[in-house]
C-alpha cells in the first residue's frame, strides 16, 4: 500500500496526533487554520506534520504565516488573519506574540475553537510532555478545577517568605466553565496552565522572582529572573507596599505605567494560577529567547504566579483587557479551602491511587509524574 503522506519520526507523529486528535478532538470536515508567526520558534517540519495529521483525520488544513506583533497585546491583529480565523472551525495557533486577546471575539461570536500550541519545535513536540496521555490530564484537571470552584479560600506560602491568603471569586466566565481543556473552545498544549482563579479580599506578602520578559525589558528589569526577590505587601486585595533590592524600584515603574491606563486597578490582585505539568521544560538556554522561555516555563506546576491589574475585567464578547503585571512566586505550598493541593511546587494529586492506576496503563507513574527541574 502506498501513501502520499511523507515519513515523519514516530515520536513526532505521536505528539501531533496526541495534540490534534486526543486533546483538540478535531473532526473530519473541520476547516483548520494553522497560524504561524515569521521569525518565531516554529519548525516548518512540525507544521507539515500537524497539517498531515489534520488531513489524516479528514479535516482541511490551511497554513498561514504572518508577522510577529511588535507591540504584543497592544497591537491589533491583521484583518486578513482575523478573516481567515473567522471562517475556520479551529485555529491551531503556534504561540508567539499573538494571544487569545486578539481573537476572543471570534471565539465567542463565531464559535472558532482555539488550539494554543507551545510545541511548535521538534524537541518539544517529541517530548514526554507533548505525549502525555489525555486521560491522565483530564482526570487531573477535573479534580483540581473542581477544588478551585468549590474551595472558597486560598493560601499561598513559601520558604522564602510568601504568605498570602484570600477568597476565590465564584464568577465563571464563558471561556473557563469547563472542568477540563481537552475538546473545549480554548485548548492549550502540551498540558498547560490551570485557568486563572480570581482573587478577593487577599492579605499578606508575595515574594516575586520574575515577571513577563516583555514587561521587564521596558523598564530595565532582568528578563528571566530577578537577582533579589521583590516583596509585595497586599491589603484588601491591593498591593500597598513594594520593597527589595534595586529591582523593586523598577518593578514599581511597571505599576506606575499601568496606572496611567487603568488607574488604581493597576495595584489590584486580579487572579492567580500555575502550570499543570511536572514535565514541562525549556529545550534551550533561557537567554536565547526569554519570551519563549516564559511561555514554556509558564506551564510547569511549580510556576505559580499572580496577575496584578485588570486581566479579568471582561464583559460579554469584547476583547479582554490585557493591562496586568505578572508576579511569579516559585515552588509554593498552596491550600484550597484548607486542603494542601501543591507542596513546594508539586501537585499532591499525583499521589492519588486512582490517578496512578490510570497512569499505569501508559507507563510508570513515578517517571510520568516526576517533576522536571525548570528553575535552578
Locate each region found by the language model:
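A conserved acidic, glycine/proline-rich C-terminal tail/linker
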Residues: 295, 304-325
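Short conserved micro-motifs at the rims of enzyme active sites and ligand-binding pockets
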Residues: 218-219, 244-245, 283-286, 317-319, ...
